[in-house]
Amino acid sequence: MESYVMSCKYAEPQFPPCEEDYSNFSDQGGYYNNPQDSGSYGGGYQSVQPPPPPYAPQQSSYHPRSVQEQHREDAEERAQHPAASFPGYREVDASGKQGYSAGDLQCQAWMTCAKSPQVQRKVVCHGKDKSPIVVYPWMKKVHVAQVNPNHPGPEPKRLRTAYTRQQVLELEKEFHFSRYLTRRRRVEVAHTLCLSERQVKVWFQNRRMRWKKDHKLPNTKGRSKNKKTTDSNNNNSGGATSVKAAITV
């Protein structure tokens, strides 16, 4: 930890060379010095070397200080050099600008280099001005004629809708798959082509009539009318014949 600063007055303690003392061990009665255990071998074990002299501590120049004095000196050094004890500390100059240390600059450079090229490319792309969205003519809702509400006199007739080529192409695709649209699909098509639901409905009605005409199919409306007229004629003819038969009888 860099926050802990060692005092310059601290002297490393000096100790004498380490020597093993076996005097206490022999007094306690070790395994080899016990005559009772080694009696079967013809006598106790006698040490060849004399025991070493007792340890006498030497006087050294090191005088241990109290913990409070050491903490006090550390606090004074931290107050004099705050940047050494706190790496992230930034000194503020008189002008108000912060001075960044070399470690902070290296950290910022590493973070910029660590980014992948894809992330850097995205940042650059977001910074540029976005290109304007292209609006094609068929996307503009200008095909519906507006009726002037302040027009004097009777209400004018509804004007025809001028469908664009793109709208007609999309409607033809829908008609190719299904000649009858559901309500949900009709709303989706109207929203996609910037049309009203009624305009899509009318276009499909007209397209079905043209399709029947091209395939020479009888008109359902005309056939129902003709059926009604034929039924009425048959009824009238049947009533006339019954009246004639009654007169002849």
From Swiss-Prot:
InterPro entries assigned: Antp_homeobox_Deformed_sf, HD, HD_metazoa, Homeobox_antennapedia, Homeobox_Antennapedia_CS, Homeobox_CS, Homeodomain-like_sf
Any one Gene Ontology cellular component term annotated for this protein: nucleoplasm
Major location (coarse): nucleus
Ranges annotated as biased composition (Polar residues): 23-37
DNA-binding region, residues: 156-215
Sequence ranges of Basic and acidic residues compositional bias: 66-80
Motif Antp-type hexapeptide, residue range(s) on this chain: 135-140
Keywords for the protein's UniProt record, in alphabetical order: Developmental protein, DNA-binding, Homeobox, Nucleus, Transcription, Transcription regulation
GO MF terms held by the record: DNA-binding transcription factor activity, RNA polymerase II-specific; RNA polymerase II cis-regulatory region sequence-specific DNA binding
Residue numbers spanned by region Disordered: 13-92, 213-249
UniProt entry tagged with the keyword Membrane: no
Pfam families to which the protein is assigned, alphabetical: Homeodomain
GO term, biological process aspect, one: embryonic skeletal system morphogenesis
PROSITE patterns given in the database record: ANTENNAPEDIA (PS00032), HOMEOBOX_1 (PS00027), HOMEOBOX_2 (PS50071)
Location in or out of the cell: Nucleus
Family designation: Belongs to the Antp homeobox family. Deformed subfamily.
Function of the molecule: Sequence-specific transcription factor which is part of a developmental regulatory system that provides cells with specific positional identities on the anterior-posterior axis.
Protein name as catalogued: Homeobox protein Hox-D4b
Gene expressing this chain: hoxd4b
